Every structure is written in structure tokens, then in C-alpha cells.
């Protein structure tokens, strides 16, 4: 066995660090170089000229002069207050204390620093001289013992320094590997089991990690979302655009209410039928009207004037039973009563809306009601006069011009009959103006009697008073 030194001696050796004389010598050399430079600077400040590292030095060109210029006042005050104190003993003689005040401040600071460096260097030299002979004696003893007695075991100080916890753990691992190899050779089990046993790696799992592996962990979320782990579940759309969801109106309203970031496609597909075409190929057509003869008037009704008497018969030939083409008449920008001048070019063998409108404004019907104009107040005006062309059929039979009907006029599309010209003067806008001012109505009738072509825009009034406005039905 290898002999080892006792632990007590080893502890003593660790406590006392060995002094390296080489390092101390190098530091002394550096200090000497610094001293040489400082002495050169001191010489230039005193008044001489020296060149340090190729640069001409003058008293005010040095950095030390610029740095210490601010401290000049402080140092002068300190010297005045402490006159009894003497400068440290150095190159400057102690017999002449007044020389410091005569010299400049940087020269004084340089002298003090030089003296301090000299003292430090002297101390280091004394230490080197004290250590050097002891080390030489030890080396002599070792050489003499090796020559006489022969080789001996080396000191274990270096080994103790190198041994770290990492090296200890590596030694333990090496021992375990050797033990495993011995067990493999001794065991009679098949090789496959041996390989399996050697491959098992037992990992220590902390309780925090075990707790995190629950439902709220990120790994669990990733397994839930990805189709790799659950191929039977359809993909969920993260942050879908509600504009491109081709669901029902209720489903879109539900989405805007909840504002949930995740909406599964299978939920939407279960709500609506799968046979629907996708939104990219869906062509939305406008809703078809109930009949061809229905008139759509967008603007709300403002004034409805009927000079005729309300008929007793119910609506029979209207498209929807309750509505008729002349239900609303607007005296604003647009009016529902279409003048016959505009529709002369578009007349067809079928009964157009303009022809239906013209039925309710036959000259006989309007002429009979003009006599009753004074008795009817404008507040009692109703919509029922314009409702249906077949309501006032009894009056058509009594009229002297009953033979000329709008259907007959439609067949004669090229020639403009006198009845159609006469009918122009009985448009609803003109009848409304007749109630407002009878003088204007007489002028307009006189113009129409001369068989002049009057445009539809000139027939309509610009302003209508508010007393004729009737609320919506």
C-alpha cells in the first residue's frame, strides 16, 4: 500500500500559503520602472527638459497638471492651516521646509508618491530576502534525502487540491460500471433481458412536475388540439372570421353574443343541413314579387287626395286582394300616379299599371265629383278612391264617354286620343292643387283645352302645405 501523510500535517500545510519569490521580484521591477518615469516627470516640472516615450514634456502639457489644478486651492489651504507638520523625509532635505511652498503643486504630489513607492519597494525586498534562504534549505534537504535513501512517496498536497466533487462522482460511476459487468458475466439470463435491464433509466421526478401533468398543463392542451393524438375529432378553427361563416342567422348572432375564440366546424355543420352549397358558390337572388302587376313605391306616403266617391264594392281584380297599384300617392319628389305621356312608348297588349291608374281618373268620374268639391273638406279625404279600378264601375256606365276606356287607348298606341289628353289634366297632383288654389286649376284646365303638350314635371306642384298630410295606413 502507498504510505500517506496524516491529516493534521495536511491541514497545517493548507493554512500556510507558499510565497512565490518570482512574482515578488517581478512586482519590484515594475515599481522600479514606474519610479524612473516619475523622476523624469519630476525633473521636467522642476524646470528641465526630458523626453518620455517620444513626447516633449512641459509643465502645462501634462495631464497631471490639468487634473491637479483644481486641487491647488485645497492643498494651499491645508499647508497654511498645518504649518507645524513637516513633509515626509525623502530626497528633499528636512532642513528646508519652505521649499515646498515655493514649488508648484504637481511637483509636491509627485514627490510624495515617489516616497510612498520607495517605502513599498523596500518592504517587498525585505520579505524576499527573508524567504529565499529558507526555500533553498528545503530544496537542499530533499535532494540529499533522495540520494541517500532512494525514492519515496510524493506529498499528497497536489492530490488533495485536484480532488473535487465532480471527480468523486466520476469515480463512483466507474465503480458501478465495473460491478454491472461482473453481474452480467455471473447471471445465466438470456441476453435480451440483460439489454433491457441496462437500458432502463430511472429519472427522479419532483412532485411539482407530477402536479403539472394534469388537465391544465400545456402538454395536455397540445395533445387535445392536435389531430395526431385524436384523429376521430375534427379540427377546431382558432379565431375564425364571422363574416365567412356560412351558418344561419341565429348561429351568427350566437357567435357575436358569446365572442368565443374557438368554434368547431362540426357544431355549425350539425345545426345546418349538409346539403347546402358553400358560401363561395352561393348566388343570392332577390325575392320574386307575388305578381307582375305589383307596384313597389319606396318613399312613404305623404298626401293622398281622392276627389271621387268611395265605392261600396270590395276589391276583386287586385293582385293581392288588399293592395292595388294606386294605394299610395306621393306628392313629393316621386308620385305613384304615372302620367300617360311617359308610358306611351312602353304600352303593351297586357294591362299595364299606368292603364290601371288611369281608370280611377276618368273625366266623367272627376267631373261629377268637382261639383261636390265645396261640400268635401280636405280633412275627410281618404285613400279609398284610389284603391281599385273596379270599385267605381257604376259610374263608368253612366258616363257619356264610357265607350273610350283605357284598354282601348292601349291598343291605339300611335295616335293620342282627345280623351287621353283630357285625362292628363286630372292627375292626382293637379287635383290636389285644385283644392289648394282654384285659380291655378282653372289656368291648367284652360291650357289643356288648347291641346298643348304639358310635361309631367310642370304638372306637379313644388310645395304642398302640411294640412293635407295624412298618417300612414
UniProtKB/Swiss-Prot annotation:
Q: Does the keyword Membrane apply?
A: no
Tissue distribution: Strongly expressed in flower buds and root tips.
Required for binding to TAN and location to the cortical division sites (CDS) during cytokinesis: annotated span? 1-132
- Provide a GO CC annotation, any one: phragmoplast
Where are its TM segments located?
A: none
User: How does a null allele present?
Assistant: No visible phenotype.
UniProt keyword annotation of Methyltransferase present: no
- Name of the gene this protein is made from: TAN
Q: What is this protein called?
A: Microtubule-binding protein TANGLED
For this chain's UniProt record, which GO biological process terms are given? regulation of phragmoplast microtubule organization
**Location in or out of the cell:** Nucleus, Nucleolus; Nucleus; Cytoplasm, Cytoskeleton, Phragmoplast
